[in-house]
Amino acid sequence: VIPARRAVVLGLVQGPAELLPVSSSAHIVLVPWLAGWDWEGVDPEVRKSFEVALHTGAAAALLIGQRHLIAEELRAFDLRGAVVLALSFLPAAVVGYKFERPIERHLGGPRATAYGLLAGAAAMLVADTRPQLRGRGEAGAADGLALGVAQAAALAPGVSRNGITLAAARWRRFSRDQANLLSRTIALPIIVGATALKGTRLARRGASPELRRSVAIGVAASFASTLASQRLIKLVERDRALWPYAAYRAALAAAVLARLRRGD
């Protein structure tokens, strides 16, 4: 069972980490480890379900906070957009459904998470050197597939769905503001799908009242912290390079690997 106070802490961390390309999943893995919590003692299925629930709380906050932008995007939605959305969803859905549990078992620890942070940082640095030639309404099937592969890669903790999809869009030569818009647009189907899958699995095995309470507290904290952190989106949306976020990720990964080497 996840204690209520820890559920609150992780929910509060989720909001800012969700809105910046720094990997919220890495922070949900590393905060308990750095704080010395017995996080490894929690059932992996429960840990992942809790993490997905935090994403759901953040997504709900974004739906409210960004409702005007979402409404504008829906009005402009067409067949081409539907193809991009479908292709961006399918690779991650298939990989997640087939390999989610092995990923949780083998890539859910601090070391693998640190490597994920480094890999995502490298991808962001390389992609952000690409020219900004493409803008609104220019995304096609190949772009959707590239974003889908990126979202599948983001199933590994530390890679960051936000960061790697920004990198994929920038690699496809989209402008920074359009890359941000694409990254946010394709997020919702993945979050809804993951919530449905985890919710179904958790319902089948049964969830104790204590676990349901912890999940509800975490979701509420994630919702509140995301809603309060909406202005962080502006930091990424401005015409700025991704290197500050890549540098933060690399520094965090280095700190984790150094601590692991010391055996702390």
Annotated model-derived regions:
Residues V1-D264:
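Multi-pass membrane proteins that catalyze or facilitate reactions on polyprenyl-/lipid-phosphate substrates
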